[in-house]
Amino acid sequence: MKKKIATMMFVLGLCVSTVLGGCGKKDADSSAESANTESGDSADDSQGDGSTFSNLNTFSCETMDGGMFTQDDFANKDLTVMNFWMTTCAPCVQEMPKLEEIRGTLPDNVQMVLVCLDADTEEEAAKEIIGRTGYTGLVTKSGDGDMEKVNSQILYVPTTLLFDAEGNRVGSTIVGSSPDLEGVYTEAINTALSEMDKEEWKK
C-alpha cells in the first residue's frame, strides 16, 4: 500500500512540474495550457520532444517589424539561438523578460531569435505580448521553406533550437521553460560553441 501511494505521489509530482514547464502545441492552439514536458529538460533530437528537427538551410521569415529573416542572416554569427513560442502558451510569455536579459548578455558571435508560431493569425496578440514583456530582440513569424518543416516538427512550446552559421542543427534541444533559464541556456550555448571549436560564453 505504501509503495502504491509513493508511486502515485511521484506521478503527481511529475504532472505538477510539467504544468510549469511548457504547453503542448495542439493545446496551445486551442488556448489551453497542458502538462507535456518536464520543466527545464534538455533533449537530443530524438529525446523528450517526440520528433527530430530539420536543418534551416533554406528559409525565409517575415519579422514582426515588417522585415525579412533568412538563412543568410545565420552567416553573420557562429551560433543562432531560436526560441519557438505561441501567444496562448503561458510559460512562453512568462519567460520572455528573462530571455531579454539573456539576449542582452550574449557574446558578439551569438544571436537570439524568437519565432512566434501563431503570429500569422494572432499578430496583434503577439505584438502586445512583446511590448508588455519588454522583449526588444528580433521576433519572426512562422516562415516557409525549411522553417515550415521545423515548425511542423515542434510538439511543445517553448522549444529552443540552436543553429550554426550554415543553418545546421548543433547542440541540444531545450524543451519547456525552467526556473533556472539562464543556467539552462548557458549550458546549451557553451556546449554548442564547444562542439564547433569556438570560445565558450564567459559570463
Would you name each region that the model predicts?
Residues 18-22:
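C-terminal motif of bacterial Sec signal peptides marking the signal peptidase cleavage site
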Residues 83-89, 117:
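Aromatic-flanked redox-active Cys/Sec active sites in thiol-based oxidoreductases
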Residues 164-203:
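Thiol-/selenol-based redox modules, centered on thioredoxin-like
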Residues 1-9:
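Bacterial N-terminal signal peptides that target proteins for export
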Residues 26-60, 187, 203:
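N-terminal, intrinsically disordered, polar/charged segments of Gram-positive cell-envelope systems
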Residues 58-80, 104:
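A short beta-strand-turn-helix
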Residues 128-165, 174:
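Short, internal strand/loop/helix patches
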Residues 93-132, 144-149:
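Structural microenvironment flanking redox-active thiols in thiol-disulfide oxidoreductases
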